UniProtKB/Swiss-Prot annotation:
It holds the Pfam family Peptidase_C2. The gene is Capn15. One of its GO terms (molecular function) is zinc ion binding. Its EC number is 3.4.22.-. The keyword DNA-binding does not apply. Keywords: Hydrolase, Metal-binding, Phosphoprotein, Protease, Repeat, Thiol protease, Zinc, Zinc-finger. Disruption phenotype: Knockout animals show significantly reduced viability. Homozygous knockout mice also weigh significantly less than their wild-type or heterozygous littermates. These mice also display severe developmental eye defects, including anophthalmia, microphthalmia, and cataract, and the presence of these phenotypes is significantly increased compared to wild-type or heterozygous mice. PANTHER family: CALPAIN, CALPAIN-15. This is Calpain-15.
Length: 1095
């Protein structure tokens, strides 16, 4: 047990005293090496260190800039640069021995100098010494660190060249001399080395030159200098599989990777011949004999390259004789703490074979795949300078994008296949080695095969947390600004202005028909400094994105998009919200702007240019802002780009504009009873007033639609009261003063105010209320109105619930066109009691080029849920739901306790079942027109919560949709007891159609039910027919039919007649011509929804 103050060594776990800075056993430093410092050294400029003061000077300096020391260069040898903190080794040059009367070691190999005999006249015992490689460094350590003051030493861990006086490495802290226990060479495992991405690869050292091959013997008078050669070593690509540079990087290995079975250590008496080095003429006979043996090997063609340094454990290893690989016969020399690996033919790489990148087996060049693991040759042998000529998907031998069988362009981020191509083989998840089917453990890292089976059967985790609204906005803006800065930098470098090629300035972006007057008036697209200002007083005002924006700044153009401008005016009551929409908030000289909008429930940052449609005189034709502000025109152009054209922005409701601009949940409160469906529930004016009061206290945005929708409007009567029909107003304040319910409204136009009761000029104002409600007098376009008049002349109130401190999560899905498709359900996990808002958006509902652009009957259902074994979903009690409506989006809100919930999104008026037999009759304006789209329509479920929640899209059972509809109808529908043991449930009012569910509680009798809805109009049936006959088994219930409103703008009518009888058999007998139990038959397209379900 460690005492107080002792510290454990991170390398050998030895307990050292508190005052000890290095480990007493392995001399490792107490603190871990600074990785940042090592990385900085790896990219340091090429410099040479001063031998006197250790200052690092640039290569061009002949003397030290600090102390003035001038190194003595070797004649004819250039000063070696230090690259990446490592002193590179010059080419090894072999020189034939001169003189026969002196005892010499023959040709020897050094790392920085050609070793020759001493110069004549020099005292015996002196010799020229230079910095040499690992062999000399090893020898210096064994001889008591005998090094000259200016030589220095190379760190054996990180190869940094250190000063002679340093006792430990200045980069990694490694000791100069190691004192670790010896480990036999058999315990060392050398893995395959791959160069790390992003690091510079030092070119490989030159190959040795044999005597007689370009290196001639020097005369005695010139033997003092280094010998030069004219032969150029063979060039190997830096990142080639055969590059020795990539294969000679030191790779540290942990101790746990040493195999458990070790052979007896080699006796220290056996010395490696490769570790011999020249020490001059004072070498003994033993070294001379070793040198002679070395020379014989070189002359016989068995030359050795400078050993590559693969230090796998920082421990001293006893020297042993060189061994050879059993597979390729390459020389593997274990000496000291160094493992030298020498290929059999390093100077001439073998291009007749290629190494498999998966299992490292060498295959013949003619083989396209590995004979063992089936790995592709392209991944194991390919020059990096040549682009790939094979398609990764179809294998076509064509350069560039594939236009053959697959027709796909190569992806920049291709997923790596970790699973083997051949059946039975398995890839280790730890080291990716391909193993044989019989192997229970990985041959490299001993990972069990059971782990692979578990990983293969696991499904990817799709559960995610909700994100804070403000954090999401900041994240989106950060990503968008990075793109914007690149575009602006490119435009500045090339002196051009940005032009958006995805929404070009042309007729297609305007989008109106060819003969339309609006299309003909667009003559040119101009930038702000080229546009003529229509207001004379604004001529001297410079252009800007914002200039103290006001709602009255908005001016509508030729487009019929007042729904969007009304929402923009409501948003302008809070200038900070408008600034959040504009990501680029200042004028851009290059003309690139970004706008953040929420289209169909999904946040999108839109990039646009500042080229705006103008007439021949240079005046703007579409929406604009006064005082030369660009925010209105840029937001409108971004919205037009999202939906395809300016033409697509025509017609809409202000609530859609609020949802697009804010991304917040929006709710519309109807003030009038629907004229298309008089049987709708009556309007509760007290409930609406309470909601408006609470919304004002919460700081929500509110807008009101005047004289539109379901109302019959007399334009003259409205204008006489100062109102503008089919126009949106902003609700500024809601007050309950002395029993009077008052609202303060603003006309975005800044003119035309209400002149009825409680108006500015109304003579019956109480004095104290006038001073309280209008302290600054009247202003143009702003007025007070009594709530009863508001109900009479306005159609609806739109509430935008902007929460700056809420969480949000958005889940994409699709509406299946039949019950046979997958039923998407969103699993919701509530961690603490929270208030939640749900909004369901239909994707692509505004685009005019969509194949199936009609609106769907959207509905949201929220249930308690339980997940059984295997994640099987079971629905519980219905907690909340939206009304089923043919709109662009619907919403609902609920307060939930901690637990598991399921959110079901459904729509039915796009179903196109094809029952067998003759075509079924459809009572709808578009009968006979195929409505089925190639792909099911998509949707986005937006979840807003006051606390953190978890959402996860899950795939439910095919019968989950039937269970959800049955629970909804039983909970909210009308109950009718037709006979004993039979109950019918109807859901019609406020549900954009009809849902009929029948329950048979008889234990033995069948229930035959016939439902006739042939007199209905503008509805479509999920059964493909308006007349159905079904046999409900005992103790079962069934969804007989779902009728859905087809066209949202047109009225619909539903008439249904129900006939039922008890029967002892399941067949319908005389009700159908065939012996069937359902008519139309329950095909797989509808069985999941309309099949009988047990009670």
């Amino acid at each position: 047990m460690a005492t107080v103050g002792e510290w454990s060594c991170a390398r050998c776990t030895f307990l050292n005293p508190a005052g000890q800075r290095q480990c007493s056993i392995c001399e490792a430093p107490r603190h871990k090496p600074d990785l940042d410092q090592i990385l900085r050294l790896s990219v340091e400029e090429q410099k040479w260190p001063c031998a006197r003061c250790t200052f690092r000077n640039f290569l061009g300096k002949e003397a030290c800039e600090v102390c003035g020391f001038t190194p003595e260069p070797v004649p004819g040898a250039p000063l070696l640069p230090i690259i990446n903190g490592v002193l590179p080794k010059p080419p090894t040059i072999l020189v034939e021995p001169k003189g026969s009367g002196k005892e010499e070691a023959g040709p020897v190999r050094t790392a920085g100098l050609v070793a020759t005999e001493p110069a004549r006249g020099r005292p015996e015992g002196e010799e020229e010494r230079e910095e040499r490689g690992e062999e000399e460094e090893k020898e210096q350590e064994g001889e008591g660190e005998r090094a000259e003051p200016g030589s220095g030493w190379a760190c054996q861990r990180c190869t940094l060249h250190n000063t002679p006086v340093a006792s430990s490495c200045s980069a990694c802290g490694g000791p100069r001399k190691l004192s670790l226990p010896r480990i036999p060479p058999e315990a060392l495992v050398v893995p395959e080395v791959v160069a790390p991405t992003g690091f510079h690869v030092v070119p490989a050292p030159s190959q040795p030159v044999l005597p007689g091959e370009g290196a001639e013997a020097d005369s005695p008078s010139t033997s003092q200098g280094p010998t030069s050669t004219d032969q150029e070593p063979p060039r190997v690509p830096l990142f080639s599989p055969f590059s020795p540079t990539l294969q000679n990087n030191p790779v540290p290995r942990s101790r746990r990777e040493v195999p458990p079975q070790l052979q007896p250590p080699v006796p220290e008496a056996v010395q490696s011949s490769a570790s011999t080095s020249s020490k001059g003429p004072q070498q003994g006979p033993g070294r001379a004999a070793a040198g002679a043996s070395r020379l014989a090997e070189l002359l016989s063609g068995k030359e050795l390259l400078p050993g590559k340094r693969l230090s796998v454990l920082e421990e001293e290893v006893p020297e042993s004789s060189p061994a050879r690989c059993e597979s390729c016969s390459d020389v593997i020399d274990l000496a000291g703490d160094i493992v030298r690996y020498t290929p059999a033919s390093p100077s001439s790489p073998d291009f007749t074979t290629w190494s498999c990148a998966r299992c490292t087996l060498r295959n013949p060049t003619t083989a396209p795949r590995c004979s063992v693991c089936g790995g592709s040759k392209l991944h194991g042998f390919q020059e990096h300078s040549e682009p790939p000529t094979h398609c990764p998907d179809c294998g076509a031998n064509k350069p560039g994008p594939c236009v053959g069988s697959c027709g796909r362009a190569p992806s920049a981020h291709k997923a790596v296949r970790l699973l083997p191509d051949r059946p039975g083989q398995w890839a280790c998840p730890a080291c990716t080695l391909i193993n044989t089917p019989r192997a229970k453990h990985c041959a490299a890292c001993h990972t069990p095969q059971l782990l692979v089976t578990q990983c293969r059967g696991a499904t990817p985790l799709r559960r995610r947390e909700s994100m804070h609204v403000e954090k999401r906005r900041q994240t989106d803006e950060g990503e968008a600004k990075a793109l914007w800065e690149n575009i602006v930098a490119f435009c500045r470098e090339n002196s051009v202005n940005f032009v958006d090629d995805s929404f070009p300035p042309g007729p297609a972006s305007v989008g109106f028909p060819v003969g339309d007057s609006v299309q003909q008036r667009v003559k040119q697209w101009l930038r702000p400094h080229e546009i003529n200002c229509s207001v004379f007083r604004d001529h001297g005002t410079p252009w800007s994105v914002f200039h103290t924006l006001r709602p009255s700044d908005i001016l509508q153009g030729l487009l019929g998009n007042c729904w969007f401008l009304s929402a923009l005016a409501v948003l302008a009551e809070r200038p900070d919200l408008v600034e959040r929409v504009m990501v680029t908030r200042s004028l851009c000289a290059e003309g690139a702007y970004q706008v953040r909008l929420c289209k169909d429930g999904t946040w999108t940052t839109v990039l646009v240019d500042d080229m705006l449609p103008c007439d021949e005189a240079g005046f703007l034709l579409f929406s604009q802002a006064q005082r030369k502000q660009l925010w209105v025109a840029l937001i409108e152009k971004a919205l037009a780009k999202l939906h395809g054209s300016y033409f697509a922005l025509q017609a809409g409701r202000a609530i859609e504009g609020l949802a697009t601009l804010t991304g917040a949940p929006c709710e519309s409160l109807a003030l009038q009873v629907s004229s298309t469906n008089p049987r709708e529930e009556p309007v509760d004016t007290d409930l609406i007033w309470a909601k408006m009061l609470s919304s004002k206290e919460a700081g929500f945005l509110m807008g009101a639609s005047c004289g539109g929708g379901n109302m019959k409007v007399d334009d003259a009567a409205y204008e006489s009261l100062g109102l503008r029909p089919r126009h949106a107003y902003s609700v500024l304040d809601v007050r309950d003063v002395q029993g009077s319910r008052l609202l303060r409204l603003r006309n975005p136009w800044g003119r035309f105010s209400w002149n009825g009761s409680w108006s500015d000029e109304w003579p019956h104002w109480p004095g104290h209320l006038r001073a309280e409600l209008m302290p600054h007098g009247s202003s143009e376009g702003v007025f007070w109105m009594e709530y009863s008049d508001f109900i009479r002349y306005f159609d609806s109130v739109d509430i935008c619930k902007v929460h700056s401190d809420w969480q949000e999560a958005r889940v994409q899905g699709c509406f299946p066109s039949t019950a046979g498709g997958p039923v998407g359900v969103t699993a919701l996990t509530v961690l603490e009691r929270a208030s939640l808002e749900f909004a369901l958006f239909q994707e692509g509902s505004r685009r005019s080029d969509s194949v199936d652009s009609h609106l769907l009957d959207l509905c949201i259902l929220v249930f308690r849920a339980t997940f059984g074994t295997g994640g099987r979903l079971s629905l519980g009690r219905l907690l909340a739901h939206s009304k089923r409506a043919v709109k662009k989006f619907v919403n609902c809100d609920v307060m939930l306790e901690p637990g598991e919930y399921a959110v079901v999104c459904c729509a039915f008026n796009h179903w196109n079942p094809a029952p067998p037999g003759p075509p079924a009759q459809a009572s709808s304006p578009s009968a006979g027109v195929p409505r089925g789209a190639p792909e099911p329509p998509g949707h986005v479920l937006a979840v807003y919560s006051s606390r953190l929640v978890m959402v996860e899209p899950v795939e439910a059972q095919p019968t989950t949709l039937a269970d959800a509809i049955i629970l909804l109808t039983e909970s909210r529908g009308e109950r009718h007891e037709g006979r004993e043991g039979m109950t019918c449930y109807y859901l019609t009012h406020g549900w954009a159609g009809l849902i009929v569910v029948v329950e048979n509680r008889h234990p033995k009798s069948y229930l035959h039910v016939q439902c006739d809805c042939t007199d209905s109009f503008n509805v479509v049936s999920t059964r493909g027919s308006l007349r159905t006959q079904d046999s409900v088994p005992p103790l079962h219930r069934q969804v007989l039919v779902i009728l859905s409103q087809l066209e949202g703008n047109a009225g619909f009518s539903i008439t249904h007649r129900l006939a039922h009888r008890k029967a002892a058999q399941a067949f319908l007998s005389d009700w159908t011509a065939s012996r069937g139990t359902h008519s139309p038959p329950l095909t797989p397209d509808v069985a999941g929804l309309h099949g009988p379900r047990p009670l």
